[in-house]
């Protein structure tokens, strides 16, 4: 076929995946016919990072772009599959990054909330946005975060992610300001709001200038594109101090340090001061604005829990501390148990859990799972049945397993432990109905049925296909399936079985329309020909490739029969150099040293 490249271009593999609808995958593919952006907000892709942490890309109609949102699933998510849980939205700081929310990147929200019965929602990105709807686009972004977080995202979480309409929001610094604004500007939306070191007076003397400077420093954003010129109506509309009355009835928690060096700071040469000069100044601003905000609430007789620490700068360890300190109040407002899991170990699962201390503490008692039982732990789940034994499922493999439905899916219960593979690169785990394979580059992918059988015949990951890079998916045009691998996808139908197509032959197959073309599904593996050529057979014909001729299809019928009489590529005509095309009264196909014309069922061979 091609130059025997070690790896087929990833664009081909992704092109295949984009034409299909995922059947069994933690990553939801988008059909080719649905590539146009939806009119309304919708989830475009889901990736399970573990059995308790999910990343989804939600198309925001307001921002006309997909927004990554991560979720930390409630403690009882797996043990009580019919239950719904309150939502706790956690907002990032000014320098929010596009890869991960700071609450999991720089603090331990994932560990802390593992045994809490709340769905934690972590929007990713939004640097310098203050999570608000901007007046105009700026710096390549059309920020409409308030619309996204208050109108577009909640219905999706309630419909598809077992989340109730009982909501709370908390954030640090910029996110603390935004938390108060979202709650105040959207009465009734939030039951609980917390600000850790937030700027809670945005219009007082010097604050607009400070925010303007901060936005310019963090990403080069113009605050005038956000709220207009200082003193304008949008600044007042986004000032928690001025929104105080609208926060009546919301459970509130605010905190800040003093700016003096604390337990998480490195002392400077000046007594009591940290080397983190910027963090010192920012925390002093946060403290002053928080105190002013609390004074306003007291005048209005609106209750608030204020925690003023005698030390501490504007940095993550203190916000991690406040996250833990405020949980009891958050849990009460959200109507969930503030305590951790109440569970113990017993039976066959106990022995494994005690030996595998990496699992962490238990999060549930045993509960039914298919024909066996399961128990949840902080870093994975353990399954047991008399027929399959006792096995832990964790990490990215555990995430994929949970994403496809776990024990209730066609995979069934695990039949072995996760093991490393001989190449030192990948890992796999076997289940009743298939296996899951993982590498850092390809992620964790399910292998089952005809694809697993054919892949096994070819040597699994050691064979020519390499590792799977996507889940099995339905072919969009005909009854069949496709699964992408590092070196070309396999196509399957009930009549043809599973066969791989790769390289330039795959390019040609794609150009013709894959299985929806006259060629249909592949019926055999690619085979070598003379002059470094390759070919693949399909239901309706073949695709031939050589370095000099390129890749072309020859369809079954009179033209193929005549070329066969001439000896195929070994005959005087050589390899094809075109697909068949219509001519007056028939069809024609060109070859390296001639052409064949078929008219009225009669073939004519012409040399060059």
Where is each model-derived feature located?
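Non-catalytic cap/lid and distal C-terminal segments of serine-dependent acyl enzymes
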Residues: 2, 11-17, 24-340
């Amino acid at each position: 076929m091609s130059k025997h490249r070690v790896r087929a271009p990833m664009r081909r593999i992704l092109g295949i995946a984009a034409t299909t609808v995922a059947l069994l995958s933690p990553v939801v593919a988008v059909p080719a016919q649905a590539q146009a952006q939806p009119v309304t907000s919708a989830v475009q892709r889901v990736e399970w990072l573990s059995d308790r942490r999910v990343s989804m890309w939600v198309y925001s109609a307001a921002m006309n772009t997909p927004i990554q949102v991560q979720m930390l699933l409630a403690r009882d998510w797996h043990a009580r599959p019919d239950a719904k849980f309150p939502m706790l939205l956690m907002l990032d700081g000014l320098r929010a990054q596009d890869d991960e929310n700071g609450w999991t990147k720089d603090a331990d929200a994932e560990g802390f909330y593992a045994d809490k019965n709340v769905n934690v929602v972590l929007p990713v990105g939004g640097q310098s946005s203050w999570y608000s709807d901007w007046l105009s686009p700026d710096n390549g972004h059309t920020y409409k975060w308030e619309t996204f977080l208050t109108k577009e995202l909640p219905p999706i979480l309630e419909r598809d992610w077992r989340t109730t309409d009982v909501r709370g929001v908390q954030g640090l610094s910029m996110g603390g300001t935004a938390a108060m604004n979202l709650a105040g500007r959207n009465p009734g939306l939030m039951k609980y709001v917390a600000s850790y070191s937030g700027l809670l007076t945005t219009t007082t003397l010097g604050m607009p200038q400070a925010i303007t400077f901060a936005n310019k420093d963090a990403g080069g954003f113009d605050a005038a594109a956000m709220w207009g010129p200082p003193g304008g109506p949008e600044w007042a509309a986004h000032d928690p101090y001025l929104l105080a009355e609208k926060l009546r009835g919301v459970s509130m928690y605010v905190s800040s340090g003093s700016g003096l060096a604390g337990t998480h700071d490195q002392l400077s040469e000046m007594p009591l001061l940290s080397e983190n000069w910027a963090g010192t100044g920012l925390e002093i601003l946060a403290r002053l604005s928080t105190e002013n905000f609390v004074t306003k609430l007291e005048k209005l007789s609106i209750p608030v829990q204020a925690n003023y620490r005698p030390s501490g700068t504007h940095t993550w360890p203190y916000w991690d501390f406040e996250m833990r300190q405020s949980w009891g109040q958050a849990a009460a407002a959200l109507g969930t148990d503030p305590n951790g899991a109440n569970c113990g170990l017993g039976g066959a699962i106990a022995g494994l859990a005690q030996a595998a201390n990496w699992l962490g503490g238990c999060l549930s008692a045993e509960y039914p799972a298919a024909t066996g039982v399961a128990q949840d732990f902080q870093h994975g789940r353990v399954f047991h049945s008399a027929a399959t034994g006792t096995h832990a499922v964790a990490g990215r493999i555990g995430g994929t397993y949970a994403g496809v439905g776990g024990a209730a899916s066609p995979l069934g219960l695990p039949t072995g432990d996760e093991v490393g593979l001989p190449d030192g690169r990948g890992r796999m785990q076997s289940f009743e109905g298939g296996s899951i394979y993982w590498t850092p580059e390809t992620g964790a992918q399910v292998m089952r049925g005809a694809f697993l059988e054919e892949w096994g015949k070819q040597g699994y990951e050691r064979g020519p296909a390499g590792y799977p890079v996507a889940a099995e998916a339905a072919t969009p045009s005909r009854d069949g399936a496709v699964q992408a691998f590092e070196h070309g996808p396999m196509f399957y139908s009930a009549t043809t079985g599973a066969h791989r197509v790769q390289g330039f032959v795959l390019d040609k197959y794609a150009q013709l329309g894959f299985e929806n073309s006259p060629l249909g599904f592949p019926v055999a593996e690619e085979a070598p020909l003379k002059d470094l050529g390759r070919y693949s057979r399909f239901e309706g014909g073949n695709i031939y490739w050589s370095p000099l001729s390129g890749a072309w299809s020859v369809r079954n019928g009179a033209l193929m029969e005549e070329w066969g009489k001439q000896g195929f590529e070994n005959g005087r005509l050589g390899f094809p150099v075109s697909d068949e095309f219509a001519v007056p009264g028939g069809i024609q196909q060109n070859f390296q040293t001639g052409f064949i014309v078929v008219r009225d069922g009669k073939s004519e061979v012409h040399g060059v």
